[in-house]
Amino acid sequence: MFVGPQRSARFEPDTMTKSSVPPNAPVALPPLVAAYVEATNSFDLERLMATFAEDALVNDQLRDHWGKPAIREWVKREIIGVRLTMNVTKVITHYENFIVTANVDGNYDKRGLPDPLVLAFYFTAQSDLIVQLIILRNRYDI
């Protein structure tokens, strides 16, 4: 799956620099991440839930949602309820972790938020399922 202009790289501490990844280089998302993004952008509750392990943890902006029942309620409210969409701009693979940067949009209260709103999604995978997802609004101005 290709989702707009992206940059992707495997993290190598001694050789990785921002300039080593060409801007706007399209790259396929890891299959699990692609499934999550596709389900999010199509507002498909069941496909989105199929990406998570039974005992997964989602931490969205410092709020924990443990296990599929809690994650289902979070998805209904915070993704489907506000018609959230993701435009992936960068992916970094680090072992079984995928760090995805995306511009997000939807029908949520945007007062006081930057445009575009850029969020970082920290996926941890095991057995082709998301076992942990941490979503943060990182600061890039420091």
Q: What is each stretch, according to the model?
A:
Residues 2-46, 50, 54, 142:
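Short, low-complexity N-terminal intrinsically disordered segments enriched in polar/charged residues
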Residues 45-49, 54-95:
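A solvent-exposed, acidic/Ser-Thr-rich amphipathic alpha-helical stretch
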Residues 2, 11-23, 73-142:
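A beta-strand edge to alpha-helix "cap/lid" segment located at domain peripheries
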